[in-house]
């Protein structure tokens, strides 16, 4: 399941781009139940980093934990386990938001006129370019009309890719 690109993208976002999170998830899946200290030792990563990742995964409801108190030391031990059955629904929710944004962006690209500064590589709407007298606010260079066909093609490809994943991957069928 973790090899699906959409799932990887969502997990990467959940873990705030911390790639160690994938290693943590793999340890959890392989062990089924493990302490944060054991994960830290196994991956040779600081315990605080492991806990930070686990808390992010817990906030997304992708892991659960049990807490046990050691009567001698009065310290708590947290045993973590994966709870990935909610992952496909989370992916669908986040990807639908991304699809909505991509469709809005595509509509803007299709219905707008844009200008571009070749020196600074900045893109402006017609309205913004007109307000600036068709001059770049950074370098003062002349803004040229921008052909956004490549941008639209890229957005359409992204939309098609996500929709194809939804339609072809059985993980997402019931959502």
UniProtKB/Swiss-Prot annotation:
Residues passing through the membrane, by range: none
Keyword Transcription regulation attached: yes
Domain of life: Archaea
UniProt keyword annotation of Transcription regulation present: yes
Pfam families on file: TFIIE_alpha
InterPro entries membership: TF_E_archaea, TFE, TFIIE/TFIIEa_HTH, TFIIE_asu, TFIIEa/SarR/Rpc3_HTH_dom, WH-like_DNA-bd_sf, WH_DNA-bd_sf
SMART domains in alphabetical order: TFIIE
Keywords: DNA-binding, Transcription, Transcription regulation
HAMAP family noted in UniProt: TFE_arch
PANTHER family from the UniProt entry: GENERAL TRANSCRIPTION FACTOR IIE SUBUNIT 1, TRANSCRIPTION INITIATION FACTOR IIE, ALPHA SUBUNIT
Annotated family: Belongs to the TFE family.
Protein name: Transcription factor E
Protein species of origin: Methanococcus vannielii (strain ATCC 35089 / DSM 1224 / JCM 13029 / OCM 148 / SB)
Gene transcribed to yield this protein: tfe
């Amino acid at each position: 399941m973790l090899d699906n690109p959409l799932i990887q993208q969502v997990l990467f976002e959940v873990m705030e781009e911390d790639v160690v999170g994938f290693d943590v998830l793999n340890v959890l899946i392989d062990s089924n139940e493990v302490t944060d200290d054991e994960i830290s030792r196994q991956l040779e990563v600081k315990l605080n980093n492991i806990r930070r990742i686990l808390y992010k995964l817990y906030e997304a409801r992708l892991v659960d934990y049990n807490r046990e108190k050691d009567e001698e030391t009065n310290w708590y031990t947290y045993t973590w386990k994966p709870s990935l059955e909610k992952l496909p629904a989370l992916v669908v929710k986040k990807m639908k938001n991304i699809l909505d944004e991509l469709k809005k962006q595509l509509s803007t690209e299709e219905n707008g006129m844009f200008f571009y500064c070749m020196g600074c590589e900045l893109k402006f709407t017609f309205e913004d370019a007109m307000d600036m007298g068709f001059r770049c606010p950074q370098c003062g260079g002349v803004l040229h009309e921008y052909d956004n066909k490549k941008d639209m093609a890229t957005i359409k490809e992204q939309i098609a890719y996500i929709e194809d994943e939804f339609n072809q991957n059985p993980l997402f069928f019931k959502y």
